[in-house]
Amino acid sequence: MAVEAKELKGTQKGAQKGAPKGEARCPGAPSTQEIIAADKVAAPKWVRSESYEFLGDEDISTDRYIEPSFAKDEFDKLWTRTWQFACREENIPQIGDYQVYDIGPYSFIITRVGPKDIRAYYNACLHRGTKLRASGSEGCASEFQCSFHGWSWNIDGTNKNVVCEWDFPHVDRKKLSLPQAKVEVLGGFVFINIDLDAPALADYLGREFKAHMDAWKLEDRYVYLHVAKSLPCNWKLAIEAFLEAYHVVRTHPQVAVSNGDANSQYDVYGEHVDRFISTLGVLSPHLYGKHTEQDILDQFTLGDSGALGDSSKPTLSQGGTARQVMADMFRGMFEKATNSDLSAVSDSELLDCFSYTIFPNFFVFPGISLPMIYRFRPDPRDHRKCLYEVLFMRPVPVDGKRPEPAEPIRLRDDQSFKEAAGMDLGFGAILDQDTDNLFLQQEGLEASAKHGLTLGNYQEVRVRHFEKAVEKYLAMDAKRPDIERLPSR
């Protein structure tokens, strides 16, 4: 006999009509924290915390998505002041290793100079400006030589050679070191900031998020799949498509069977970080009364099947829940795959979708079952396009030998994410669904007689939080690199 999906009795604060702005929650459904509290293995403090703040309910102007002048202001004011994920430490493990990172018109050679010394050099010859390394390139170098006239620099940034130095008596080679951006490393991620006056990365992120990230130990993971694709929309629209679970029931109906979408939790941390927690292995409140616990269990099979190494379909015992069966199964499979004891790892960490955004363009999904990274970068030549990257991560093997990080797979505009070698087909379908909406949204905003986006107070608070940060930086003066102040050693 089929067992109807179990519904926890919800005590959602503010679910009643007339609640203060931002306090209304999905009526008749348990909160995310109530679902997690019922789990067999308790969740840690960083999971059990809440940090919502009502940020207003006015429309968001559409100009920021469709006006070329807005994109120019972003390059002059926003991208020159914010911390950005440039590469992983594993991309440049040896001294001399480098990878080129571009953002808009700016380009940097991210280089390992010493075991604990990573630098970000402006990717331009100080003679007549030619790029020292091509965009998208990587490798290992003993010097950076210009392909035009042959001027060269050591990997520590000092000038190595000026061809026909006799013709440049006015040039002091001691002052000819490559200028640099600021660099910091956190969780194996290399961040850069063009602004020399920018706060330290820890201050930019805030103490609470820093504590969360320290708990994940992402430096002990490696990138096993890296997929990139150009999207036909403004970079902010692409980011905002992933900031809420409100779209799940319409855009991903196949997932709603096992996703607590309308009762997901949304948090904001300071100016630059926000989060949602979306519980999995539970039925969407939109579908209450329409599915059994076995239906939930049957659907909830998306994820990194390659890492799990087990394709068997689980079944539900009498009185059991899909969520608990999946937690037990995931725990056992990951213990076997990683030769580790996960008995103290909470059910929530094993199952649920945790999505953190670091402004302006970096997503971290630190869950055990499918840790991922998203990065979005605007196209410097067309504000209606952006580059979307998905990086999937796995634990470093128990023998400590770190595999080589995956080379990026660049999909054509007309290709499905499912065509990327190594992509889980179910998850690839979800990414296709997410991104297929974006061209229609970009065109719709340009055609609309309504010049604003209307947002929900709770479920879309991350969109508003993100756009408030955009507004903060665009209210500042343009900031361009000043070579007289740039550090060089």
Regions found by a protein language model. Give the residues of each.
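Rieske [2Fe-2S] iron-sulfur-binding domain
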Residues: 2, 92-215
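N-terminal pre-ligand scaffold of iron-sulfur
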Residues: 2-3, 7, 20-136, 181-185
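C-terminal catalytic domain of Rieske-type non-heme iron oxygenases
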Residues: 3-9, 13, 17, 21-28, ...
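N-terminal short leaders/motifs
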Residues: 40-69, 133-148, 177-187, 299-337
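Short, flexible segments with low predicted structural confidence
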Residues: 41-50, 155, 208-211, 347-348
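Short, solvent-exposed coil/turn linker segments
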Residues: 61-62, 87-88, 172, 200, ...
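Short Pro/Gly-enriched beta-strand edge/turn motifs at strand-loop
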Residues: 80-93, 162-167, 356-360
